[in-house]
Amino acid sequence: MKTTTAVSLLLSAGIATANPLAPRSSGVQGFDISSYQGTVDFSGAYSSGARFVIIKATEGTTYIDADFSSHYEGATSAGLIRGGYHFAHPDDSSGADQATYFLAHGGGWTNDGQTLPGMLDIEYNPDGSECYGLSASEMVSWISDFGETYNSKTGRYPMIYSTADWWSTCTGDSTEFSTNYPLVLAQYASSISTVPGGWPYQSFWQNADSYTYGGDSDIWNGDSASLSKFAKG
């Protein structure tokens, strides 16, 4: 995923059906975008087989993606299941503060069957210390603070987007989130080799950093019916 300054490599978690270590020959196509993509042909993406999109909403407690509203409206009009994501800055403010900011600017969830739970994009710091100056235990506490705040306001835990490498390096490969937080795993390869943190499988797989209609390519680990069920909660 792209921050305001850099490209990231992350995503995965949740409720799915396939073996995460097996080569994927099926699943549901989707993609993730931010203001870097500008105008997006959502109807074209839907016609080509995409059924969901994850859209950047916020970053830290000061940044709102300029195209979030238009992207969200366009995705809705095209019939795509959609949701927002928040790029974390654990060195900037508390998890609770950032979850509150995310919720105030498009990151909410409703059980309409068309809205994904919000996603926490947590990855290497594009501007400084790779783990934002936090120890593994401090990082786990920060993520929990974000997630519990989000859950208290929506009734859903957020999805967590990351890479296996970052998760191991910056959380000590914590298993604390593997039960309630769906994993969006970034791993650019023909198949998934490592699922971190005790998650039995990824819910979504960011399998490439480009997609025909913009942004990164993502695959839901299941069929269309299970994707709709996941969105509805």
Predicted feature locations:
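Functionally critical loop-and-helix segments that line ligand-binding/catalytic clefts
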Residues: L21-G38, E176-G233
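Aromatic-lined carbohydrate-recognition surfaces of secreted/lumenal glycan-active proteins
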Residues: T154-T169
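Fungal secretory targeting signals
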Residues: M1-P20
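Substrate-binding cleft of extracellular glycoside hydrolase catalytic domains
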Residues: L21-K153
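Glycine-rich, charge-decorated loop segments at or immediately adjacent to ligand/cofactor-binding or catalytic sites
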Residues: S94-D97, S168-E176
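Hydrophobic anchor at the start of a short beta-strand
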Residues: R82, R156-P158, L183
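Structural recognition of alpha->loop->beta junctions
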Residues: L103-M119, Y124-P126, G172-Y201
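Short, solvent-exposed loop/turn segments at secondary-structure junctions
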Residues: P126-S129, W166-C170
